[in-house]
């Protein structure tokens, strides 16, 4: 386009005409990238206007206690070599394994998710009718079922790494999100009695400190296996927790505030 329009004025006019002609195509590209791109974003190097910002941010999980690594020794045997009557193996290796209690953190940018799924402006999400927020509510509802119940699948054959979350906290608000990772600035010792209960207590203590410093600005609900008191929060089952969030997003306000 620049070669065809060397003059700045004609180039500007050509770009404006191109954008006008391609406006519907660009909108279709943004709206037609599928659920995965709506959740986790998409980068298109050939057309930056077709890129999409992620609506879900996932932090790297870390253990809340001192890590202890074990070496797992294993060999890979060459069956053909053995059948030939020779000694040896195709490889001798070891892998490092660690079993820990992890803290994970996930943020869902609801306005961005609605914008990605519905093709609306993120800043206008609160004024949209419930029908425009319904799909996003259902997506987050399903996501909330997946986060605590689906484990990473690496080395499944030799470790069976399947587990469900023991504590799940959901906070909803319009402030910038904030992690509770600072609760574990000082890692728990491995010999800590009642390790899981101690970790949850550290989280609730951190919540109390943040509330005291910044005020209670978030609606929160939680799931827990153990007896725990979370400041300004109600305990729910996973199904009720996911339904609460879905209703919150669809209505645009806390379900408890709707008469």
State where each predicted segment sits.
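Basic polyanion-binding and macromolecular-assembly surfaces
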Residues: 1-259
